[in-house]
Design a protein with these regions (language model features):
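Acidic, contiguous N-terminal accessory segments
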Residues: 1-144
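Feature activates predominantly on carbohydrate-active enzymes
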Residues: 11, 88-293
Length: 293
């Protein structure tokens, strides 16, 4: 069933709250009432499979029947068209809902992903089906890095929990996960060269000793987050907050042995994921007072 043009406000549908609020929003009169959607992606849209999956998730959360085609339009549905615009930089996008069709233009995967999260907030559901207001949105992030830090060094969180949390915060355009993997209570990442680091014997008994992430789990998390436009920044904290490291390897942070071990394990971590997927590794550097804790 096709979209129905609505030229006046519809009482049963609430006005959408957009979080974070876009850079520029021009609201028209009325909007479009519809019962299904069809999505068309231009051939040059980047990471099409990821965007198709995200589109299905957006409409699926409302129970909206959606068909997706990479090449052809279908009759009888409100059409969403995604097209690449090289003139739109970074994670910016332009989203338009008009009577004839709805469109998204962006110059990158991040721009398209952000637009879909705004689209997610534009949809209303009522007795008459689904509704989107007539609107023109031009948006770009105020901050290039919009992050969340999880202190799993002190408080272990399961991979499933982290993935679900990232799924939720991605809807608000968070694009960075800072993963604090090590601290005094525990070392949470598998290091094949130094297996003692994840041994429960060297972890605090009160902080889920022996719980850690395998290298495969880190790879899976990086890939999963990439599909949500989130970059993972793993952190190995040093020289402060290094009790678990010092106990497991029986070293002081000022020892040459400790330095060599840190270099080796950082190299091992860097080899796990291609640089383009995980370009940054955080090494803490807090409390560098020249003293051993």
């Amino acid at each position: 069933m096709g979209g129905e043009v609505v030229t006046a406000p519809v009482p049963e549908f609430s006005s959408p709250a957009l979080i974070p609020y876009p850079s520029k929003v021009v609201r028209g009169k009325g909007g479009v009432r519809f019962k299904s959607v069809h999505v068309h992606l231009d051939r040059d849209v980047p990471r099409r499979d990821d965007l198709v999956r995200e589109m299905k998730d957006v409409f699926g959360m409302f129970g909206i029947p959606a068909s997706v085609s990479k090449d052809v339009f279908e009759e009888g549905s409100l059409t969403w068209e995604l097209s690449l615009d090289a003139g739109i930089e970074g994670e910016a996008y332009i989203l338009s809902v008009a009577p004839e069709k709805a469109t998204v233009r962006a110059g990158s995967f991040g721009g398209f992903f952000n637009a879909l999260q705004t689209l997610r907030q534009l949809v209303s559901k009522g007795k008459g089906g689904f509704f989107m207001p007539s609107v023109q949105i031009s948006d770009e992030p105020a901050f290039a890095l919009r992050g969340m830090m999880l202190d799993v060094g002190r408080y272990y969180m399961s991979p499933a929990f982290i993935k679900e949390l990232m799924r939720r915060v991605s809807r608000y355009k968070i694009n960075t996960l800072h993963l604090h993997l090590t601290d005094d209570p525990a070392w949470r990442l598998e290091v094949k060269k130094f297996p003692a680091l994840t041994d429960r014997v060297f972890h605090w008994k009160s902080r889920l000793p022996g719980k850690f992430y395998t290298q495969e789990q880190l790879k899976e998390l990086v890939d999963y987050c990439a599909g949500l436009n989130i970059q993972v920044i793993p952190e190995i904290d040093m020289p402060g907050h290094s009790q678990a490291f010092r106990k497991a390897l029986n070293v002081k942070m000022s020892d040459e042995k400790a330095t060599k071990a840190l270099v080796a394990l950082i190299k091992e971590m860097c080899s796990l994921v291609p640089k383009e997927k995980m370009p940054i590794i955080h090494i803490g550097t807090d409390e560098a007072h020249g003293k051993d804790e």
